[in-house]
């Protein structure tokens, strides 16, 4: 198999609710290379978020296979999966999921501390990431003292602190105003170029998706390339 950063083949996903079975993903196959910036667009309920969860190993497909750096997520155990996610993947969500009692700096340090990394090294790297997202002056602030855009920048810094090869972002600007949304997208493009981090963004914002070099469209569980 050709070397891809991310590769999925024939992904199908069903959800069972009582006697009702719903197919959410229908034979999805696609690949991403290192450093790519890709958007998946589609209406609410089209299967975008489900696909992102499957690609990130947060949910299992009913059938099909996902490969990260040529390693199948379906052929490793839970500990190996957690290690692979920590090594290669970062996650950003519509809601920042920051811990309210911790400062911006402490929130960004958290993935490294969980990974048992040296505290002073974790602090140094977290400070650098907060500087990279334009928040060097806000590192001691708790989430409640930050704006919505600033909180999402902290979440992006946290997703990047372990130097992932790929960041999976689920509607990262979904609850932000237009000006803030555009600044977050500009930040993602800047980080992509400067650090060669690949981003896969799920969004329903077609205007922003058009700024990216590659777009995929999800409709009723079917993924197709937009040309």
Curated annotation (Swiss-Prot):
Coiled coil region boundaries: none
Localisation: Cell inner membrane
Disulfide bonds: none
This protein's UniProt keywords: ATP-binding, Cell inner membrane, Cell membrane, Membrane, Nucleotide-binding, Translocase, Transport
Recorded topology in the membrane: Peripheral membrane protein
MF term (GO), any: transmembrane transporter activity
Sequence ranges assigned to domain ABC transporter in this UniProt record: 6-227
CDD domains, per database record: ABC_MJ0796_LolCDE_FtsE
Residues engaged in binding ATP: 42-49
Quaternary structure and interacting proteins, as annotated: The complex is composed of two ATP-binding proteins (LolD) and two transmembrane proteins (LolC and LolE).
Protein name stated in the entry: Lipoprotein-releasing system ATP-binding protein LolD
Gene source species: Pasteurella multocida (strain Pm70)
């Amino acid at each position: 198999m050709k070397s891809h950063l991310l590769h999925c083949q024939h992904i199908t996903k069903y959800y069972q609710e009582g006697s009702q079975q719903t197919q959410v993903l229908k034979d999805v196959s696609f690949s991403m290379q290192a450093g790519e910036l890709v958007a998946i667009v589609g209406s609410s309920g089209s299967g975008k978020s489900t696909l992102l969860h499957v690609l990130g190993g947060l949910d299992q497909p009913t059938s099909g296979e996902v490969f990260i750096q040529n390693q199948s997520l379906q052929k490793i155990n839970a500990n190996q999966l957690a290690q692979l996610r920590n090594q290669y993947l970062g996650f950003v969500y519509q809601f920042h999921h920051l811990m309210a009692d911790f400062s911006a700096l402490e929130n960004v340090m958290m993935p490294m501390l969980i990974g048992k990394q040296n505290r002073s090294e974790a602090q140094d790297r977290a400070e650098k990431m907060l500087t990279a997202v334009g928040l060097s002056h806000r590192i001691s602030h708790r989430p409640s003292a930050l704006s919505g855009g600033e909180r999402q920048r902290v979440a992006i810094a946290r997703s990047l602190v372990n130097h992932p090869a790929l960041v999976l972002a689920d509607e990262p600007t979904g609850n932000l105003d237009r000006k803030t949304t555009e600044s977050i997208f500009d930040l993602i493009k800047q980080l992509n170029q400067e650090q060669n981090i690949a981003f896969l963004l799920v969004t329903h914002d077609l205007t922003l998706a058009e700024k990216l070099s590659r777009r995929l469209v999800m409709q009723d569980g079917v993924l197709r390339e937009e040309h």
